[in-house]
Amino acid sequence: MIEGIPPGGRGALFIGGTWRPPSGGRYSPVVDPSTGLALGEAPVATVEDARAAADSAAENEERWARVPGHERARILRGAADRLAADRETMARLIASEVGKPITDARVEVDRAVGVYRLAAEEIRQLGGESFPADAYERPAGNENRFLFTVRDPIGVVVAIGPFNFPLNLLSHKVAPALAAGNPVVVKPTSAAPFTALRLAEHLTAAGIPPGVLNVVVGPGDPVGDALVEHPATRLVSFTGSTSVGKRIAERAGRHAKRVILEMGGLDPLVVLEDAPLDAVVGATVRGTFGYSGQVCTASKRLLVHESIADAFGRALAERARSLRVGPALDEQTEVGPVIDGASVERLERLVEDARGRSASVLAGGSRVSIRGGSFYAPTVLDHVPEDALVVREEPFGPIAPILRFSAVDDAVRIANATPYGLQAAVYTKDLSRGLALAKRIHAGGVHLNDPTNLRWDALPFGGIRESGLGREGLRYAMQEMTEVKLISINYAGS
């Protein structure tokens, strides 16, 4: 039994400060992608459980909002300390639940520790503005008024997390919500419930009062829908697919609720003819094959100038073939499994479609058989046409499709020929050309001479178009999770 999984292998729901079984008595298996074997069982919450969690959060809304900011900061720092002390157990839990190589899983824990510490710091920066009242003619009497704004907690926040970063991306929702004075209902992915449940243990031990943090595990329909539509919930923060994000936005919109959506992407990496080849290949290996490509900011379309495309393809294929594919808990593994067998089948379909459209396979292109796990070889495709499915659908796997271009205008057109717009990257020695391209590419972030998958936890992160709404990044998420209130004071005759 992996440490961190409850005795008996069954998880529980966390509602109102107590652990309880799902009211319907149902559980679903949690499968290790590296082996295909069950790690334990996730509780399957009911609509009644979801409503109870939202009710519990609502009952404690005012209580948590009244906790002084310095006390909330102390609790968040305590949670960070507990996570840091539990680093190895958390990392092994992540690796086992979602197949992330253990070396990467440790980095995820470290990033999450930093998120809680940053959230504690940002509490001091969450302020309002003052205004020169006498600068406004109307209403009359402004020379005797003082005007300022404050930020109030928005209310109950629903945090819906993905499988690929079951600790860090969930923390990017939970930490700013708590820091801003909001209670939270967490719905982690059913593929990785134990990471979220252990996080709840650490937050509770650090001092989060009962009912302020609640965790329910279950399918989006009906459990997620019940949370989104509950009268007490005021904001939904979601990371996942665009189709599910749209569904959440539609349902939240019916009740005028705010959403933060981090959704899909087809992030382009543009390689100009003067780019340093070794640096670009190294960045592509990290940006495309890291965590088996199951990253929303992975480099999913490699737009390479035709003059260097042959050399780039050969070098990337050589690196791809050298990557060690293996179980997540193996310290030597560089590329682990994808999340499940259905993902392997989808990758096979995308590669077969590309082959049928005259793309060539330079490396990989097939599944890898290792102890019953769901593995797919790091794959490099060349001469990929623009109508291939692999560059129209987010693959979420270790596939590097190369699209060749001859003119910069063509590169921009191809980069923008997608409904998404999360991240992008441009490699060139000419920074003026790079900056010009950065302005023309439609994305929430553009990196020059760095891979697409960079993220700074304290800085704004998010997409445009169908990649998302709103921004994460501690300060920016806290702004989304608060309401601006204007206060006026008339001191005439006081």
Q: Language-model segments: which ranges?
A:
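Short, structured beta/alpha segment
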Residues: M1-S96
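Conserved C-terminal structural/oligomerization subdomain of aldehyde/semialdehyde dehydrogenase
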Residues: T35-E41, T233, V270, R324, ...
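Residue-level signal for inorganic ion chemistry
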Residues: G36, R72, I94, Y116, ...
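Short, well-ordered beta-strand elements within core beta-sheets of diverse protein domains
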Residues: A38-A45, N60-R66, V158-A159, L269-L272, ...
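Structural signal for hydrophobic packing residues in well-ordered secondary-structure cores
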Residues: E61, A65, A80-R87, A91, ...
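N-terminal Rossmann NAD(P)-binding subdomain characteristic of aldehyde/semialdehyde dehydrogenases
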Residues: A65, H70, R74-L170, L213
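Rossmann-like NAD(P) dinucleotide-binding subdomain of oxidoreductase/dehydrogenase enzymes
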Residues: G128-A279, F405
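ALDH superfamily catalytic-core signature
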Residues: L235, S243-P385, L448, G493
